[in-house]
Each structure stands twice: as C-alpha cells, then as structure tokens.
Amino acid sequence: MRLLPIIGGLCWCCLLALGQAESGSVAGSIFDSAHAPAAGISVEARNLETRTDYKAVSSAKGEYTLVQLPPGKYDIFVINPKYGPFVRRGIVITAAQPAHLDIQLSSNTALTTLGEMPELRELLSKKPPPPQGPAPRVADGKPDFSGVWLISPSSLGGSSQQPDLLPWARAIYRERVLNSYKDKPSARCLPELAGFLARWPIRIVQTPKLLVALRSDDVISAHQVYLDGRSFPKDLEPSWQGYSIGKWEGDTLVIDTRGLNDKTWLNMFPHTAKLHITERLRRPDLGHLEVETTYDDPESFKTPFQTKIVNVLSPDEEVEEYVCAENNQYSQHVSTN
C-alpha cells in the first residue's frame, strides 16, 4: 500500500518536469544608469496573447531569471521609480532555447522626455549662444521676463525628481508605458499642462498686472498669470490650464496655479484635480530664464516633487500658429476604443 503514495509522488514530479520542459525562460543582468549591477530590481514579462504577467527580482549581482514562460511573444519591461522605463517588445520565448536579455537602465528624467526628441536636438544644435548682459528690468525695478524663450541644451536630460506615485497612479502609469502612450491627450488634440518648459518657442509678454505666455506647441496657445494682487475665486471651476496668480519674492516671480482638471497628463503620470503647481521664475542675466516647478497632489503622489530647467533667450525664433487638426499626424494611429 505504501507504493501508492510513492507512485503518486513520482507522477506529480513527472508532470511538473513535463510542464517545465514545455515552458521557456529569459535571463540576463540589469545595470543601473552608471553601468553597475542593479540589485533588487523587479523585471516583468507580459505574454502578448494571454496578457499574463510574470515577475522576477534581480540578485545582488544584478542577475535575473524569468521562468515557466509559456512559448510565445513577450514584452519585457522594468518600471522603477529610480529609473526611466525600459521596455523591449516582441521577445520570442521558446521551450527549446532559453532567451537572454541584458537590461541597461537610464537615469529618470521624470517630467521631460526631451532627450528623445531628435527634432528639438537638431534645432538646439544650430542655435547661437544666448545674448549676454544683465537682466532687463521694468519701471518698478522688477526683472522683465519678456522675450522668446527656448529650452537650453543643458536641460535636455532634465534636472528633476521622480514622483513617488500612490498605488493607483503607479498602476495607470505602468499601463501607459506598456501601451506606448497611445492615449496621450495631445494625440487627440487635447491641451497639455501649462508651464514655462519651452520645448518649442514660447513668448512671454509682461505687464505690471498680467504676464502672458504664448505657445506654439499646444491647443491652448496663451496662458495668463495675474499679477494684480487678486486672490483665488472661492468657487474655482476646474479647467485645462487652471487659474494662475503671481507674486514677487524679491527678483523671483512665484506663480501659484490651482483649479486644474484631472484630464491632462503630467508628462506620462496621472494626477487628480487636487494638483497644485508652484513655479519660481528667475532671470539671472539677459540670456537665461530659470524655472523651478513644484508639483503637489496628495491624492496621486506621496510627497511633492520638483523639476528644474533653464530656458535661453532666442530672439531669432518666432511663435508660430499651431493648428492641431492639420499637424496631428499621429492621431490616425491612436485607438478610438
């Protein structure tokens, strides 16, 4: 009678071995942005047919192995707050041959993917150095931010903190990465968040009571900042660009923006209508405009986080009209489901 449990155990082991023999694996090493082995990094594989996810964690030496993968095509990805997202699509897994994939992680530029915009890189490479001299001032002695501005080459890599996302926001961000950002609002001619990141030329017009930023890369081409000492309306209706009030702290203009809706993307990150943006603008000299931005949304981020960029004065540039319906060639590839 003792043979029955033994035989049963042998049969189970045989079935388990057979299942492992019919599955595949992928292994490799993970390196951080300094090219050193990255330990404790979660790497995942998504079966493109079943949409099933498989997970492994890298060892102290940065090595990982994803096992028991049914044969088929997979997306292999790492989405970690410390690094930029890594996605390798369409990896073929077979039972006969283990796959190998080393993963090189990049530094996280958080709110800017500008380094991946070849058109912008080409434009900036042809720009002459910004003009030199002291920052101009208006009649009351405050710095004058007026002019046409474009992001500096030194800011292409970004100087930004990574938002520490709450679980619901992290899950949405993860899916946006895996879906190649196909539902990004701008792909449907919807507005982006206002701000002074000059990916393409922006013109700032400054008066004693109002500052206006004119853009050439968004559906809403003008963003108003009130400088007349007003307070926020009591019943602030959420809108695409929110409501912005500016106050001076010495030579720094502090812009407080509230009343944003939750429809825009903060680069690729989700946010709620609780999002509060604080921008600090400084013009240390004639040719440079420093922009430090703090994002606070307690319903999306565990703590506030900052970005820092520098724009350069570009008097040879113009802010041209932007007609999204004519320019948006990507929309035909976006799912309408």
Task: Please give the residue ranges for each predicted region.
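Conserved aromatic beta-strand anchor motif in extracellular beta-sandwich/beta-rich domains
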Residues: 45-47
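Bacterial N-terminal signal peptides
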Residues: 5-17
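Short beta-strand elements bearing conserved aromatic residues within extracellular beta-rich modules
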Residues: 41-43
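N-terminal secretory signal peptides that target proteins for export/translocation
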Residues: 1-2
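PEST-like low-complexity, intrinsically disordered acidic/proline/serine-rich tracts
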Residues: 20-22, 29, 33-36, 52-54, ...
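Generic alpha-helical structural signal
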Residues: 13-15, 25, 137
